[in-house]
């Protein structure tokens, strides 16, 4: 069974401006055989998976994770002028496939993305 952990870089998305954070998926495979992994990502309103339009769902092909190894894959989450400072709940569904192409495992995980006002530089 694979393990999924999530993090962002940078830690905070800034509100009311066009910027992005990278949501990084880390998939670990402690199992005895290699698996192919893909993930569905869903974001709420006012943030997007595309820089210029509203895209709320997407799929990431993480790749083949060999036994006792891990892979990391990043997806950009974009803010815009409608992105308010609050917590946004992102949903990730990870699928792992065996060598016959059959879904071996399905894992759902949520991640709270923090959005804040950008602090002005002070002297």
Q: What kind of feature is each model-predicted range?
A:
Residues 73-82:
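Short, hydrophobic beta-strand segments
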Residues 46-61:
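Short beta-strand and strand-turn-strand segments in soluble, beta-rich domains
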Residues 92-101:
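Enriched for extracellular/lumenal, surface-exposed ectodomains of secreted and cell-surface proteins
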Residues 30-48:
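Short acidic, flexible loop segments centered on an aromatic residue
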Residues 102-123:
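Short beta-strand elements
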Residues 31-37, 85-87, 104:
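Short acidic/proline- and small/hydrophobic-mixed sequence motifs that coincide with surface turns
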Residues 1-30, 59-64:
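Beta-sheet-dominated interaction scaffolds and their linkers
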Residues 16, 81-91:
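Short glycine/proline/serine/threonine-rich loop/turn segments at secondary-structure transition edges
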């Amino acid at each position: 069974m694979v393990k999924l952990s999530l993090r962002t870089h940078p830690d905070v998305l800034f509100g009311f401006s066009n910027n992005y954070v990278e949501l990084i998926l880390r998939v670990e495979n402690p199992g005895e055989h290699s698996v192919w992994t893909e993930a569905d990502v869903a974001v709420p309103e006012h943030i997007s998976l595309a820089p210029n339009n509203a895209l709320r769902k997407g799929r990431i092909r993480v790749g083949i994770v060999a036994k006792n190894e891990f892979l990391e894959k990043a997806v950009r989450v974009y803010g815009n002028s409608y992105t308010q400072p609050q917590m946004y709940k992102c949903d990730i569904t990870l699928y792992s496939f065996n060598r016959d192409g059959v879904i071996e495992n399905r894992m759902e995980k949520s991640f709270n993305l923090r959005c804040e006002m950008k602090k002005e530089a002070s002297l």
